[in-house]
From Swiss-Prot:
The gene is cysB. CDD domains: PBP2_CysB (cd08443). Homotetramer. One of its GO terms (biological process) is cysteine biosynthetic process. One of its GO terms (cellular component) is cytoplasm. This is HTH-type transcriptional regulator CysB. Keywords: Activator, Amino-acid biosynthesis, Cysteine biosynthesis, Cytoplasm, DNA-binding, Transcription, Transcription regulation. It is found in: Cytoplasm. Belongs to the LysR transcriptional regulatory family. It comes from the Bacteria. The lineage of its organism: Bacteria, Pseudomonadati, Pseudomonadota, Gammaproteobacteria, Enterobacterales. This protein is a positive regulator of gene expression for the cysteine regulon, a system of 10 or more loci involved in the biosynthesis of L-cysteine from inorganic sulfate. The inducer for CysB is N-acetylserine. CysB inhibits its own transcription. Residues 1-59 form the HTH lysR-type domain.
Length: 324
């Protein structure tokens, strides 16, 4: 059994059982991957993949367990390399972050600017996607950190640390009837067409929950994953915008009126997560603390030692998180 064989079977699964696509991604040949997979199956005496002719059709029950363990083994191999790098070049390496557009556009720029200035030899890579894509990227080892708010149930296999609370604002054009009000009730908001986030992005679930709580149904006429797109369509008069407060900039958006909506919606919590098996380099600890100052190295280590995210939630229950 070779590490290369384990990497091949994991990557085949990552590429939806498409061996040709896997070969392209690994810069190797399709016959070479197929041969190594067969050799591993012969050595183990079981099929990892079910086949129809030359095509892989699904992962067998035994194969699912083998793939899970192979991921753990490869994660440990990466950890060994990280340990070596920490002792050889503590300020040199790479950092892969998976996050949403809102975090990348509004919450992270200052953090990343300071981080790059401090660690010029650390290459920083950002992957933007949906919460599901973010979870997959970190779970599969394609990203080191997940930074997200929505769909946190997808992250049960990760250590998730709370970073900050945030809430929403209503945005309208100056000639809109709501522009003259300093506060808006959810009943008043329900009377207008809404422009907001796509379900599963940037606290959208809390918007739906708030309307359900009031026994109302929101009239959502347009959704997008990007707050800048939402603001564009508010300017076009399509409806009333509901977006993260951090996405409203008085200097960049002088033609929009912002109304605080914290009385209507409960706050949401953004978290940073990583695989439990990840060896955190010194610069990774520093990135976490730059993003969330209360997450010192000692606090992170204490949280990692806990057995579940429920215990981590309890650990932070009495800690006041920053508000954005």
């Amino acid at each position: 059994m070779k590490l290369q064989q384990l990497r091949y079977i994991v990557e085949v699964v990552n590429h939806n059982l498409n061996v040709s696509s896997t070969a392209e991604g690994l810069y190797t040949s399709q016959p070479g991957i197929s041969k190594q997979v067969r050799m591993l199956e012969d050595e183990l005496g079981i099929q990892i993949f079910a086949r129809s002719g030359k095509h892989l059709t699904q992962v067998t029950p035994a194969g699912q367990e083998i793939i899970r363990i192979a991921r753990e083994v490869l994660s440990k191999v990466d950890a060994i390399k990280s340990v070596a790098g920490e002792h050889t070049w503590p300020d040199k390496g790479s950092l892969y972050i998976a996050t949403t557009h809102t975090q990348a556009r509004y919450a992270l720029p200052g953090v990343i600017k300071g981080f790059i200035e401090r660690y010029p030899r650390v290459s920083l890579h950002m992957h933007q996607g949906s919460p599901t894509q973010i979870a997959e990227a970190v779970s599969k080892g394609n990203a080191d950190f997940a930074i997200a708010t929505e769909a946190l149930h997808l992250y049960d296999d990760l250590v998730m640390l709370p970073c900050y609370h945030w809430n929403r604002s209503i945005v309208v054009t100056p000639d809109h009837p709501l522009a003259a009000t300093s506060s808006v009730t959810i009943e008043a908001l329900a009377q207008y067409p809404l422009v907001t986030y796509t379900f599963g992005f940037t606290g959208r679930s809390e918007l739906d929950t708030a309307f359900n709580r009031a026994g109302l149904t929101p009239r959502i006429v347009f959704t997008a994953t990007d707050a800048d797109v939402i603001k564009t369509y508010v300017r076009l008069g399509l409806g009333v915008g509901v977006i993260a407060s951090m996405a409203v900039d008085p200097l960049a958006d002088p033609d929009l009126v912002r109304i605080d909506a914290h009385d209507i919606f409960s706050h949401s919590t953004t978290k940073i997560g990583f695989r439990r098996s990840t060896f955190l380099r010194s610069y990774m600890y520093d990135f976490i603390q730059r993003f969330a100052p209360h997450l010192t190295r000692d606090v992170v280590d204490t949280a990692v030692a806990l057995r579940s995210n429920e215990e981590i939630e309890a650990m932070f229950q009495d800690i006041k998180l920053p508000e954005k």
